[in-house]
Amino acid sequence: MYKMQLVACIALSLVLITNSAPTSSSTKETQQQLEQLLLDLKMLSKMVNNKDLKLPRMLTFKFYMPKRVTELKHLQCLVEELKPLENVLNLAQSQMSQLEHNGDLISNINITVLELKGSETTFMCDYDDEAATIVEFLNKWIIFCQSIISKRLDN
C-alpha cells in the first residue's frame, strides 16, 4: 500500500521538476532578448552621446536608478523610467533629426524588457538617493545587460 503512494509521490515530483526546469530554448531565447536589449540601449546611448547632440538641457534631466541591479526582476526599474526617458528624447528630437527613431527604440526596449521580466509587477524598486543623468542612466543599464549576458555564457 505504501509502495503505491511512494511511486505516485515520486512520479509527481518528477513531473514538477521537469515542468519547472528551464529548457535550453528558453535560455537561448532569454539570451537573444538580452542581446537585443543591449543593442537598443547602446543605440540610444550612441545617439545621446553624439558630438553634435550634446544638448545641455537634455543632460539636466535626472533619472532614478535602483541601488542594486543584478537580476532580471530589476528590469522593472527600467520600465518605470522609460516614459521620462522618452519625454527627454522627444524634447531633444525637436532640435536634432538624429533622434527621430527614438520612439521605436523605446517601444522595442519596453517590449523586450516585459518579455524578459515577465508579467509580474509586484517587485518594488529600491532607488538610489542620487539621480543620474541620461548618459549615466543608459550606461548603467548597458553594464547590467553585459553582466547578465556574461554570467549566462559562463554557466
From Swiss-Prot:
SUPFAM superfamilies: 4-helical cytokines (SSF47266)
GO (cellular component) term, any one: extracellular space
Keyword annotations from UniProtKB, A to Z: Adaptive immunity, Cytokine, Disulfide bond, Glycoprotein, Growth factor, Immunity, Secreted, Signal
Residues bearing glycans: T23
Annotated disulfide bonds: C77-C125
Molecular-function GO term, any one: interleukin-2 receptor binding
Pfam families: IL2 (PF00715)
Signal peptide: 1-20
Gene3D superfamilies associated with the record: 1.20.1250.10
PANTHER family reported in the protein's UniProt record: INTERLEUKIN-2
Function: Cytokine produced by activated CD4-positive helper T-cells and to a lesser extend activated CD8-positive T-cells and natural killer (NK) cells that plays pivotal roles in the immune response and tolerance. Binds to a receptor complex composed of either the high-affinity trimeric IL-2R (IL2RA/CD25, IL2RB/CD122 and IL2RG/CD132) or the low-affinity dimeric IL-2R (IL2RB and IL2RG). Interaction with the receptor leads to oligomerization and conformation changes in the IL-2R subunits resulting in downstream signaling starting with phosphorylation of JAK1 and JAK3.
Name of the molecule in the record: Interleukin-2
Organism: Dasypus novemcinctus
